[in-house]
Curated annotation (Swiss-Prot):
<dbReference type="InterPro" id="IPR036397">
    <property type="entry name" value="RNaseH_sf"/>
</dbReference>
<dbReference type="GO" id="GO:0030145">
    <property type="term" value="F:manganese ion binding"/>
</dbReference>
<dbReference type="GO" id="GO:0005737">
    <property type="term" value="C:cytoplasm"/>
</dbReference>
<feature type="binding site">
    <location>
        <position position="31"/>
    </location>
    <ligand>
        <name>a divalent metal cation</name>
    </ligand>
</feature>
<dbReference type="GO" id="GO:0003723">
    <property type="term" value="F:RNA binding"/>
</dbReference>
<keyword id="KW-0963">Cytoplasm</keyword>
<dbReference type="InterPro" id="IPR022898">
    <property type="entry name" value="RNase_HII"/>
</dbReference>
<feature type="binding site">
    <location>
        <position position="123"/>
    </location>
    <ligand>
        <name>a divalent metal cation</name>
    </ligand>
</feature>
<protein>
    <recommendedName>
        <fullName>Ribonuclease HII</fullName>
        <ecNumber>3.1.26.4</ecNumber>
    </recommendedName>
</protein>
<keyword id="KW-0378">Hydrolase</keyword>
<comment type="function">
    <text>Endonuclease that specifically degrades the RNA of RNA-DNA hybrids.</text>
</comment>
<dbReference type="GO" id="GO:0006298">
    <property type="term" value="P:mismatch repair"/>
</dbReference>
<keyword id="KW-0540">Nuclease</keyword>
<keyword id="KW-0479">Metal-binding</keyword>
<keyword id="KW-0464">Manganese</keyword>
<dbReference type="GO" id="GO:0043137">
    <property type="term" value="P:DNA replication, removal of RNA primer"/>
</dbReference>
<keyword id="KW-0255">Endonuclease</keyword>
């Protein structure tokens, strides 16, 4: 089911509870991190939450501090019924386009679940191309706690990856900007040229190939 415009504010468990009453038992929230950066992968996460959990402060990962995301990360993994992480590389972003690479990362995250989901709650307006019942939610990471949990996992995993990549390519400062197009990052690309982590089709990179 495709939703183009958000409805009025409801409980952040409204969709999960409604679907549970309809008989769904493995409702996976899905979100991604890293569509916009000039470098690094797109990371997606799928999270199946239990009926009862305790994750204070859980919300859209972009609206909470890095410190709280790091605190929530192990709590979500511990309390979730299931979760999976999927990546699409910078080369796949270039070869497919960023939307298709994002959907690929989401499919890979779902493939990493121990048991298949029976319903998907997807952040955004583009369904995952799988034969599963699903609902897209614009601004879903602030409207569904399952999506919010996936948002946190995806963001933390991607930030940690970019910090690791900083050790391989320290001249670009990936640990600080995480691959986004900061002034310092753009200046480094102009000075040094792109590295293998950069997205060659993105403006701000392709000019220096």
């Amino acid at each position: 089911m495709l939703e183009l415009f958000p409805s009025e504010d409801v409980s952040p468990l409204y969709f999960e509870q409604r679907l549970s009453r309809q008989g769904y038992r493995r409702i996976a929230g899905i979100d991604e991190a890293g569509r916009g950066p000039l470098a690094g992968p797109v990371v997606a996460a799928a999270v199946v939450l239990p009926p009862v959990f305790d994750l204070p402060g859980l919300n859209d990962s972009k609206k909470i501090s890095a410190k709280l995301r790091e605190k929530l990360f192990p709590q979500i993994r511990r309390q979730a019924l299931d979760y999976g992480i999927g990546l699409a590389s910078a080369q796949e972003v270039d070869g497919l386009n960023v939307l298709q690479a994002t959907l690929l990362a989401m499919r890979r995250a779902l493939d990493r679940l121990a048991q298949p989901a029976d319903y998907l709650l997807v952040d955004g307006i583009t369904p995952v191309p799988l034969p599963l019942p699903q609902k897209t939610l614009k601004q879903g990471d602030s409207r569904s706690l399952s999506i919010a949990a996936a948002s946190v996992l995806a963001k933390v995993v991607r930030d940690r990856l970019m910090t690791t990549y900083d050790a391989r390519f320290p001249e670009y400062g990936f640990a600080g900007h995480k691959g986004y197009g900061s002034a310092a990052h753009r200046a480094a690309i102009a000075r040094l040229g792109p590295c293998p982590l950069h997205r060659a089709t993105f403006r701000g990179v392709r000019e220096y190939l």
